[in-house]
Every structure is written in C-alpha cells, then in structure tokens.
C-alpha cells in the first residue's frame, strides 16, 4: 500500500526499481503458492495464499509501465497495472477475510487445524460450506466473481509488460485454483472423520456466520463495481475493460485446475496430504518444509549475523563506546575532586588564588 501511495514518486524518480518489484513479486507469488499446495494446516494454506495474493498486487504495481503520453499523463498500460493492483487489494480483502473467518468456524467445530481431522463437513456446516465455496471460486478466478475481474486485469497488465511474466502469473493463478480446491475438498468432502462419533460438528452461531454471509455477498458483486472510476495512477477515471483472449485463457486454465483438484480429491477417502506425499514425496517434503526457508533464516541470523556481526558489534559497544563514556565519567569525577579541594573555607586561600589569577591576567595583557 505504501508503494501504491508513493507510486507517482516511483514513476518519476525510480522507474527502474519497478522492475525489481515485478520479479520479486513474481517469485514470491510462485513460492507461496507452491508451499500452500503442500500444507495440511488450513490456516497455513490461507496464510501462504495471502502472501501469494499480495505478491500479485506487487507485480501489478511493478508492471505499471513508466510511459507517458505527450500531455504528460500516464498511458493506459501504466494505469491498468496500478488500478488492477488496487482493485485486487479490495476484492482480496473481501473473500480472504471470509475464508479466514470460515476457517475459524471450522476449527471451532472440529477443534483442530489439520485437514486430516476434517472431511464431510458440508453436511454439518451448510452456511460455512456455501460461503467458503463462493470465496474459493472467487480466488480461483471463476468468471463473474470479484476475483476474476481483478486477477484478470493483473494478468493483462503482466502480458503488456512481458509475455513471460504474463504466462508466469497465469501459472500461479492456476496453482491458486488448485490448492484452494484441495483445501475445499479436504474440509467439506470425503468421508466423515472418526472423531465425529464422539464430538459431532455443528454450524457456528449466527454471530459467526453472519459476517460470512455479508462478505460472500460482497464477493459475488464486488467485481462489477466500476473501480477504475475511483482509482488510477494519474488521478483520472480509467474504464475497466477485459481482454477477451486473456480472460478466456485464464478462465479455462482456472477451470482446468479446479477440475484437476476435483478429480483427485472429491469423494476420496484418503487424506489429502497423503496423496500429494505419495505421488511426489520429495517435492512434497520440500514444499511442506517451505523449501527450508526457515532453516536458511535461522542459519543466516544465528550462525552469521549473531556470531560474526552481532558479537563483534556488541564487544565494540561494550568496550569502546561504553568504555569511552565510563572514562568521561571517571575523569569528571576526578576533576571534581580536585576542584572541590579549592573550596576549603579558608579566606587566605581564596585571596591567594585570586591574586595568582589576577597576576596571570596582567601578564597575559602585557605580553
């Protein structure tokens, strides 16, 4: 959001930095989507999905081309990327909030975050099921829902920036549809979990389901809001339009990804995580471990920064910086002791010091 607010400054003074924003966002989107495909904790799936979707927004901002018309106004391609990123910020806030709240209702019902402790919940939680499905369809980019419009605009901006970037983000969008419906089928389809015998799941109270209904309703109609009339990089209205070829291609790919997830997971009795692990054991382990980014972070921070950077800096701070100020304090104390000796209450001593001082001033004046 800060990049979006400061976007005119980026375009004017650092347009080359937007290229870094584009490719860092593209790599982050793919990384987070890959990790989400292997997680079994529903909150982690949604968390990495959020990382991926925020990366989508960053890519859109970076893909805003720094070109200007003769009047000095940003061209349509530049406005498209900016508008698409902010539009996706709005639509994503709606359906992702609904998904997280729905996950809270599910965890409240089964007392677990793991998909292995779920299954068949559509019979027990109909409202949560329908609202969750609507938001999964939206984030997957199914035509007509809010996520389709904003994500399609981002992909269009990416194709204007670079065909490679456009296809890359289309792949990430396909992965998004796949892992979201992997999550959906793992929670609401399949056979009932054995734990349901002792603790039967139930729908959340209306205080929890009412926000789901409101957010899913906004998700249904949010894409039809003329967002371009409110937000554009140049501060002028920008009419949203769909590139038919890109829209059809991205829609078909999203539906194929949903179909693949449906074929693999719908109605199956084997736990979701076990299927991926059995089919791609090594790749699944890498993705489940988040490609060992946590271990890399721990190594860099503890083995390198703390040992070879932080410790020398701490020694320098303790012995040099603190030592210098300790020396100043010691010197000031010693000087005060010496000066305090002059204040002995003897008038003769005061007169002597005054005379010596006056003599020194006289000598300085005549010399």
Each model region followed by its residue ranges:
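Select subsegments of transmembrane alpha-helices in polytopic membrane proteins
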Residues: 50, 205-217, 326, 347-353
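Hard-cation-handling environments
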Residues: 201-260
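Hydrophobic alpha-helical membrane-insertion segments
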Residues: 135-139, 211-226, 290, 305-315
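Aromatic-capped, Gly/Pro-kinked transmembrane alpha-helices
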Residues: 228-246, 266-367
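Alpha-helical transmembrane segments of multi-pass membrane proteins
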Residues: 139-144, 220-227, 262-266, 362-366
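Hydrophobic alpha-helical transmembrane segments of multi-pass integral membrane proteins
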Residues: 2, 132-133, 212-222, 257, ...
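Hydrophobic alpha-helical membrane-embedded segments
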Residues: 96-99, 174-183, 254-275
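Hydrophobic transmembrane alpha-helices and their helix-loop junctions in integral membrane proteins
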Residues: 1-203, 216-218, 224
């Amino acid at each position: 959001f800060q990049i979006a607010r400061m976007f005119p400054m980026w375009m004017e003074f650092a347009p080359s930095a937007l290229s870094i924003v584009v490719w860092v966002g593209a790599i982050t989107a793919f990384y987070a989507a890959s990790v989400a495909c292997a997680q079994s904790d529903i909150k982690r799936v949604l968390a990495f999905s959020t990382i991926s979707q925020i990366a989508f927004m960053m890519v859109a901002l970076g893909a805003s081309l720094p070109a200007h018309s003769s009047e000095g106004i940003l061209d349509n391609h530049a406005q498209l990327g900016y508008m698409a990123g902010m539009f996706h910020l709005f639509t994503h806030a709606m359906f992702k909030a609904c998904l997280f709240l729905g996950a809270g209702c599910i965890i409240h019902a089964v007392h677990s975050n793991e998909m292995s402790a779920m299954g068949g919940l559509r019979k027990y939680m109909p409202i949560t099921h329908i609202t969750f499905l609507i938001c999964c369809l939206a984030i997957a980019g199914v035509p007509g829902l809010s996520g389709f419009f904003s994500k399609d605009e981002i992909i269009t901006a990416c194709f204007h920036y670079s065909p490679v970037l456009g296809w890359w983000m289309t792949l990430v969008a396909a992965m998004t549809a796949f892992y979201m419906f992997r999550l959906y089928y793992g929670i609401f389809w399949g056979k009932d979990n054995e734990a349901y015998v002792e603790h039967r799941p139930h729908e959340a109270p209306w205080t929890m389901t009412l926000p789901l209904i409101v957010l899913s309703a906004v998700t249904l109609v949010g894409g039809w809001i003329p967002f371009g009339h409110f937000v554009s990089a140049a501060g002028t209205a920008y009419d949203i339009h769909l590139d038919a070829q890109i829209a059809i291609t991205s829609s078909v790919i999203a539906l194929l990804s949903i179909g693949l997830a449906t074929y693999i997971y719908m109605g199956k009795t084997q736990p979701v995580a076990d299927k991926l692990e059995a089919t791609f054991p090594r790749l699944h382990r890498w993705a489940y471990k988040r490609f060992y980014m946590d271990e890399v972070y721990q190594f860099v921070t503890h083995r390198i920064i703390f040992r070879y950077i932080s410790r020398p800096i701490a020694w320098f701070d303790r012995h040099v910086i603190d030592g210098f100020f300790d020396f100043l304090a010691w010197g000031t104390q010693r000087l005060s002791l010496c000066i305090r000796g002059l204040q002995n209450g003897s008038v003769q001593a005061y007169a002597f010091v005054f005379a010596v001082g006056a003599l020194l001033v006289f000598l300085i004046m005549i010399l």
